[in-house]
């Protein structure tokens, strides 16, 4: 299997487990970007608790699913997005207004598009979920 990106593999595992009706999913390898992405998802209630398991290698993450996720994905390549262009990407990626989130990596950290708009920061789009 060709590994495209660690974040892509993690979100693909979550998507597949949600479609299969699983209650939890094991993600490996672990990375800081995946953990921050999961924290944003957890903050909005799309996943339950998650814990990082240190296996003295690349690490694992066990995520509790609550069945609320419809789809999550990665945007590759990571496009630079100005604050004025952000609405165009939100319309393109999400199915409806007030439904789902676009995740950006900014100088202030990894956050959703609403928080980026509030803090008035822009950056690169890394993914979305709804």
Swiss-Prot record:
The keyword Cytoplasm applies. GO terms for cellular component: cytosolic small ribosomal subunit. Keywords: Cytoplasm, Ribonucleoprotein, Ribosomal protein. The keyword ATP-binding does not apply. It comes from the Eukaryota. InterPro entries: Ribosomal_uS8 (IPR000630), Ribosomal_uS8_CS (IPR047863), Ribosomal_uS8_sf (IPR035987). SUPFAM superfamilies: Ribosomal protein S8. GO terms for biological process: translation. It is found in: Cytoplasm. Component of the ribosome, a large ribonucleoprotein complex responsible for the synthesis of proteins in the cell. The small ribosomal subunit (SSU) binds messenger RNAs (mRNAs) and translates the encoded message by selecting cognate aminoacyl-transfer RNA (tRNA) molecules. The large subunit (LSU) contains the ribosomal catalytic site termed the peptidyl transferase center (PTC), which catalyzes the formation of peptide bonds, thereby polymerizing the amino acids delivered by tRNAs into a polypeptide chain. Belongs to the universal ribosomal protein uS8 family. This is Small ribosomal subunit protein uS8. It comes from Neurospora crassa (strain ATCC 24698 / 74-OR23-1A / CBS 708.71 / DSM 1257 / FGSC 987). The lineage of its organism: Eukaryota, Fungi, Dikarya, Ascomycota, Pezizomycotina.
